[in-house]
Swiss-Prot record:
Pathway membership, UniProt: Secondary metabolite metabolism; methylglyoxal degradation; (R)-lactate from methylglyoxal: step 1/2
Residues of the signal peptide: none
Protein name as catalogued: Lactoylglutathione lyase
UniProt domain VOC: residue ranges: 27-174
The organism's taxonomic lineage, starting at the top: Eukaryota, Viridiplantae, Streptophyta, Embryophyta, Tracheophyta
Protein's organism: Brassica juncea (Indian mustard)
Keyword Heme: no
GO molecular function terms attached to this record: lactoylglutathione lyase activity; metal ion binding
Length: 185
């Protein structure tokens, strides 16, 4: 007799398998990072990771800006500002960079907590690439800081890099992730 899948309700107390009709149109839309310097962060997410800037919102009264980035073709995005905002908020899996004005030039500013030191909390985001080893060779040439390279540690073929604010980004590919995570499957 086959055992229950790890993803089954029997193996996951609290898991609801009945999707409420009210949640039918929900998507995971964004993860927000606070950033010290938008110039450094925009360079990293666009040039290093290949994301596009989907929308920028400036809140001058509150002195902060939001930058939404993702893996979208912006050539067909609306040009009307309101329509572009709605379009952006309809894209799945975007990164929202929040910049509180002045942090980039404030010598007293100590930076933000990335969640990977005590007290631990948020861990990382993940980016799928075509080939984890080739991507990491490129990242190395670009001077990206690594937490873990694909050949390090017990879990091979995955890497962790840091963005300019120290947030961790897991890098993996679909060719190897199944075997890398195979023992946990």
């Amino acid at each position: 007799m086959a055992s229950e899948a790890k993803e089954s309700p029997a193996n996951n107390p609290g898991l609801s398998t009945v999707r409420d009709e009210a949640t039918k149109g929900y998507i995971m839309q964004q993860t927000m990072f606070r950033v010290k310097d938008p110039k450094a962060s925009l360079d990293f997410y666009s040039r290093v990771l290949g994301m596009s800037l989907l929308k920028r919102l400036d809140f001058s009264e509150m002195k902060f800006s939001l930058y939404f980035l993702g893996y979208e073709d912006t050539s067909t995005a609306p040009t009307d500002p309101t329509e572009r905002t709605v379009w952006t908020f309809g894209r799945p899996a975007t990164i929202e960079l929040t910049h509180n004005w002045g942090t980039e030039s404030d010598p007293e500013f100590k930076g933000y907590h990335n969640g990977n030191s005590e007290p631990r909390g948020f861990g990382h985001i993940g980016v799928t690439v075509d080939d984890v080893h080739k991507a990491c060779e490129r990242f190395e040439q670009l001077g990206v800081e690594f937490v873990k390279k694909p050949h390090d540690g017990k879990m091979k073929n995955i890497a962790f890099i840091k963005d300019p604010d120290g947030y961790w980004i897991e890098i993996f590919d679909l060719k190897t992730i199944g075997t890398t995570a195979g023992n946990a499957a």
